[in-house]
Each structure stands twice: as C-alpha cells, then as structure tokens.
Amino acid sequence: MSSKKIVLTSSDDECFEIDEAVARKMQMVAHMIDDDCADKAIRLQNVTGKILAIIIEYCKKHVDDVEAKNEFVTWDAEFVKNIDMDTLFKLLDAADYLIVIGLKNLIAQAIADYTADKTVNEIRELFNIENDYTPEEEEELRKKNEWAFN
C-alpha cells in the first residue's frame, strides 16, 4: 500500500513531493491536510527550498520516532553539527513556522551549546546586538555582576 503524497512548494518555488506521514511531522502542514487544504501543492511562503529540504530530511528520519528514541540522540547531534549558524537561525524560524517541535528544540539547544562559552562581545556579534551602554555603565554592570563575567 503506497502512502498518499503531499506536495510542498517553497518560497523560491522549489517543489517537494513527500509522503503524508512525513508531511504530518510539520504540525502546520498536518492541520492543512486535516482541513482538506492539501489537494494541490501547499505553498510555504516563509521557507526557502534549501531550508525546507533540511526540514524534510529531519522529518523523514523522525517519521517513526516513537519506536527508536535512543537512535535519534546520535543522529540529531550529527544532523546539526555541521550546519552553520546562519542556517541554524533560518531553520529555527522555519521549524517554528511549520511547528516541528522536536527540530525547534534541537536547534535551540544547538545554539545554546554554541553560545555557552562565548564572551558578551562574541554573543553581541553573533546576534547582531548593538552595545548601547556607555563605557562607564558597562564597567558598573561588570562590577555589580562580576560572577557572570568570569
């Protein structure tokens, strides 16, 4: 018995034909299927083809994740290991939009792990945060919260 196919179209017009079970790992898409809105291609305005391909890869691997939880710990770690930070941020946005909770949590943890040993200035640079403290204000904060800067 073959599975029903769902077509997803990215914001840059890449089409992906995937099994319904894989598509249902994306809760937003699952709701569209349940509401009979998936007869034709489902257009995902906020997700590029590059990002959608990565999400589909994750969903394909996790389609039967109830049976093999331990197997995924290693696979998930390898999955995010070589993805650059810019792509991780885009994946996080897309996983949030598509409601892929496991992927969203995985990426959030990967970003947290990456930033764990960074300095304040490195984190500002990573997240494009402007330092709006005067040197005097910053020095006062460093003294007041010395424990956080060691």
From Swiss-Prot:
Pathway(s) annotated for this protein in UniProt: Protein modification; protein ubiquitination
GO BP annotations, alphabetical order: auxin-activated signaling pathway; jasmonic acid mediated signaling pathway; protein ubiquitination; response to auxin; response to jasmonic acid; ubiquitin-dependent protein catabolic process
InterPro entries: SKP1, SKP1-like, SKP1-like_dim_sf, SKP1/BTB/POZ_sf, Skp1_comp_dimer, Skp1_comp_POZ
Induction comment from the UniProt entry of this chain: Repressed by MEA and the polycomb repressive complex (PRC).
Region (Interaction with the F-box domain of F-box proteins): 92-150
One Gene Ontology cellular component: nucleus
Keyword Nucleus: yes
Main location: nucleus
Alphabetical UniProt keywords: Nucleus, Ubl conjugation pathway
Tissues in which the UniProt entry reports expression: Mainly detected in the siliques.
SUPFAM superfamilies referenced in this protein's UniProt entry, alphabetically: POZ domain, Skp1 dimerisation domain-like
Compartments, record wording: Nucleus
Family, as annotated: Belongs to the SKP1 family.
Record's function text: Involved in ubiquitination and subsequent proteasomal degradation of target proteins. Together with CUL1, RBX1 and a F-box protein, it forms a SCF E3 ubiquitin ligase complex. The functional specificity of this complex depends on the type of F-box protein. In the SCF complex, it serves as an adapter that links the F-box protein to CUL1. Probably implicated in incompatibility response after hybridization.
Alphabetized PANTHER family for the sequence: SKP1 (PTHR11165)
Oligomer status and interactors: Part of a SCF (SKP1-cullin-F-box) protein ligase complex. Interacts with CPR1/CPR30.
Extra facts: This protein was called 'Meidos' in memory of one of the murdered sons of the mythological 'Medea', as MEIDOS is repressed by MEDEA.
Protein name: SKP1-like protein 17
Organism encoding this protein: Arabidopsis thaliana
